């Protein structure tokens, strides 16, 4: 081989060696730092890419040493591997970056998983078809020509003889001519067309993935990953064109490079560098960024970070749209983690900026509450972070929680307008409501200002019934089994709070977060502990159980006057808190939660949000905390129960009695959270044992 014929093979050999080396290093980082599983798709991707680079290096080196006869089959086999691992990356992008609807409806999550499964099966069968088809065509070409080639890179065919007088000539003596399909043997035309179709399908698949994942990519990685993916699409498109348009002679291939023209040099190096080497490097970058790992032990594994808590630092978090505002004035946003073991995870973050001492105390209290609670029916706490100035002043506090976009008040609003005249409804309409409604409109039933405006601030004016204001829409009421099951979940969460001596103090439907399966509620979780109070402070309990003489005297002084004189701050705080943390105070605080739970029962029965009102009928007079006192002059008539309940009072009697007992005018007659939980547990058990109603959401969905 002349010395100048070594130039392009040597360049390509170096490029493929670098690609393979980078793939090996990346796979080791994925395994030992990112904690990817050995049998994960990530490692399968790197294995295919390393295999391709190895095959390219071997065949190029072999061709540089000696003339390889029939080696074109081996030189083109890595082209098939390129399509295989490029398809795997597209599949992973869909798998890891689902549509936002997955977070809105669990059914959408199932759809995404279904798409991934379908995509996996399509990719498997496509690979089987591609490899089988190519091997078959290579075999036919080997039999006809004796030197099987494809993709417009044909070996030396001068030794081939033909017995047909009208056979298409396989050799051209012209250099730099643009060869079209008519200048080749039909088997080569078929090979080129087959591979072109494979590349075209790969291009379409990646274009679809780019369209579906653009927004999530932008949220998580900025514009970086989208630009990388766009360059990849351009490279695949260029390679597809180069398969069809070939300025080289049929004697040219990666093993037999025609050196008569610089045009052929440029074409050959462009085909492999732009069409395979650069895309391979881009795919490595995309794969490395995708954080889809199988191992569950993320705690303290590090990743790019030194510790698990570093995940929540402000520079590692991308904050997105505003979700709402907490009771303390903190802003709640949707956010994603940009790097670390939880990279790509979506969470809700409560942000308190320009913190005063009261703000810091409020949010730190909420963090302490979350840290003590572990229940599937309480919004889970993920972590927290602080931005501290050089002087030690705290400028910002962030509290990270699991992301649940729906609240019970919005779901009740949806059901209140998705029914029919018979009190039933359409699950399809309800599902479409959640999928296609961009923003929820405020319910007139969620604010007392609605009634204030209509009552003209006149206590003697006619009382307004909420249901009378909605016309031309019908409610989609819950079934008995659903109401019992949802209330049972909330009661478990509430009892978990009270068992830990924590009073929520702001229990209402817009602080109950719900996940959905199809169009039905699957799980109810209590959240938003902005103004909750914990009564198990060790210092306070010690003061109450075993006060010193000085502490006892200060307790007596506190009850005798509105203020207390203290000598030191360390003594004052537990005394003041202890003075307001008597068994009677704790019982009263818990009874507030039970009263609020009773209004949530009413919300389920009427599809209204009475628990969100500032005024809660006459029972509001029993709130001891000023936070809950009825400060408005608006009167709201205690609502009548809907007709569907009156038609079957025997069935609904246990739930109605629970509602009445929880909203009793005498707080001492209200049940405890444990009593509520046991009552609903028995109702739930009766439903299952009787089999009169299908209580399982999954069964309900499958029967529709």
From Swiss-Prot:
Residue ranges occupied by any Protein kinase domain in the UniProt entry: 317-682
Keyword Transmembrane assigned: yes
Positions annotated as glycosylated: 147, 158, 251
Cytoplasmic compartment residues: 27-42, 98-121, 207-224, 287-704
PANTHER family, A to Z: SI:DKEY-192D15.2-RELATED (PTHR44305)
PROSITE patterns: PROTEIN_KINASE_DOM, PROTEIN_KINASE_ST
One Pfam entry name: PK_Tyr_Ser-Thr
EC number(s) from the headed UniProt entry: 2.7.11.1
Positions of the catalytic residues: 506
Enzyme class name: transferase
Protein's UniProt name: Seven transmembrane domain-containing serine/threonine-protein kinase 2
Record bears the keyword Glycoprotein: yes
Location in or out of the cell: Membrane
GO cellular component, as recorded: membrane
Species in which this protein is naturally found: Dictyostelium discoideum
Disulfide-linked positions: none
Entry's Gene Ontology molecular function annotations: ATP binding; protein serine kinase activity; protein serine/threonine kinase activity
Segments traversing the membrane: 6-26, 43-63, 77-97, 122-142, 186-206, 225-245, 266-286
Membrane topology (UniProt): Multi-pass membrane protein
